Structure formats: C-alpha cells, structure tokens
Amino acid sequence: MHRKALGLPRNEIVQQIIDGIDDSISDFASYIPIGNVVKKLTTWQNQGAEILYLSSHSSLQNVKKDEIVLKKYDFPKGPIFYPKEKDWNFVIEEAKPDIIIEDDCESIGGEYQMTYPNLNKEWKAKLISIVIKEFGGIDNLPDDITKLKKWRS
C-alpha cells in the first residue's frame, strides 16, 4: 500500500485511492507491506509453496518498482507476472498458479478490475480463488497451506 496509508483504517485508505489526491499513491517504489504479509508468505514457502506475484502494472518500468518493494521488505523470492498488453488469461497461462489470492479492488471499481472474475471458464475451474478486502491484508488466512487450499472467501 502507499506509504501515507500507514496506520489508517481500511475505509480511509480506500477513500484516499478513490479521491486520488495523495502523491504517494502513484509512487509505487515507496509502497509498504500490509500487516505480516512477508511472514505469512515465508511460512507458506517453507511448506513447499512456490510464491508467484501478479502485478497489475503493464509496463516493465513499473514492475521494476514492484521488485524494489519486494526486495526492500524481504518478501520470498518469486517471479512477477504482469499483463504486458495481454489479458489476464495469458498471464495466468504463463504463471500456472494453483491458488490466486487477490483483493476485491474496491477503490478502483471492484470485480471488473480483478483477475479471477475475468478469467475464462477453463482457468476458473482449475484455480482456487481467495478474495480479500482491499488493504485488509492476508494475516487472517491459514498458515497451513493444506488448510489454505480449502479456504473459501
């Protein structure tokens, strides 16, 4: 999330994005993790999960900013997949995840901005979709990846 959102309630962060008046919103290289996301992802990786990152950015320049944040905060290593002028079906075909965890995109229009709802039926049938509240974090998701695979939003 953008750095000026730190310490604010989720609903205020969403409103900041909707209003778009804070410069830190578009300063992607200065983004900060939400909650204990690094610990959670590391826990899953230690159980054998391969961590893949999906970026909403379509330019390599902005994806590089995502890389800066991932390295700065010691996120588990993993490739970053992004649209590259293609739709999400192509991105998912390239990444081939088992589970997709994404936020509900509340501040930018909701479901039509999300990945899973815009996939074809074939991919929807293959993937486990977990939707979290935007800026809500993943701390409440199970630490055990076998339980995560059974989780339903």
Locations of regions flagged by a protein language model:
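Alpha-helical substrate-recognition element adjacent to the catalytic core
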Residues: M1-Y82
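C-terminal cap/substrate-recognition subdomain and adjoining C-terminal extension
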Residues: Q45-E50, S58-S153
